[in-house]
A protein has these predicted regions:
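Terminal helix/beta-alpha structural elements that buttress the NAD(P)+-binding lobe
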Residues: 1-206
Length: 206
């Protein structure tokens, strides 16, 4: 069951942090959307690289995000992480609910903001819009020393092996919110659409 919850979300987190974000030990990393399917993997993967991790989530998920390794947790219902004096080397943004300038404000001068398939303030549906967002992020980043990168993860066997090693070593554990039967798939989708899933939602095919 845990293995079934890994591939897409964990690869998205791994490639975003390692390949796009160039994560290094000792860096200060912020994960916006830390309690979701990708975010729970991102927190653990960032910790495996030796980063100091801050997770952003709602009140009900604070303990969860702390339990998977976050050094600091920001409750977005009580505090806006873009309105503090804290600066980060890497922002892994899975929500996109802040403007370009707000994200610039909390990045170090040579910091990187990685957006998983988003290019502005808010999620966008459709491949064309996502690619437009990627181009927009690239053009903007040419005018500042900070980098803003939007991407879509690519599945490959090599990264699956990396993730397998993290699972076996105990450095990464899938967080499963709910499990549905195949004939309950519609219910699972409705739950996901609410945007409040903690970790992954799994459909059991047996």
């Amino acid at each position: 069951m845990q293995a079934a919850s890994v591939p897409v979300a964990a690869i998205t987190a791994l490639q975003g942090l390692r390949d796009k974000g160039k994560i290094q030990a000792g860096q200060k990393v912020l994960v916006n959307g830390a309690s979701g399917g990708v975010g729970t993997f991102a927190v653990q993967i960032a910790k495996s690289f030796g980063a100091e991790v801050t997770g952003v989530c709602s009140t009900r998920n604070v303990d969860l995000v702390r339990s998977i390794g976050a050094d600091h947790v920001v409750d977005y219902t009580k505090e806006d992480f873009t309105k503090t004096d804290q600066r980060y080397d890497l922002i892994f943004d899975l929500v996109g609910n802040h403007s370009f300038s707000e994200r610039r404000h909390i990045l170090n001068p040579n910091g990187i903001c990685v957006m998983a398939g988003i290019g502005g303030a808010g999620w966008h549906d459709g491949m064309g819009i996502r690619l437009a967002g990627e181009l927009d992020a690239y053009v903007r980043s040419r005018f500042v020393s900070q980098k803003f990168i939007s991407y879509i993860a690519q599945f490959n066997k090599r990264d699956m092996m990396v993730l397998g090693d993290l699972l076996q070593s105990g450095k990464m554990t899938p967080v499963i919110d709910r499990t549905y039967k195949l004939n309950e798939a519609a219910d699972a989708l409705r739950y996901l659409e609410q945007g409040h899933a903690r970790g992954k939602v799994v459909i059991n095919l047996e």
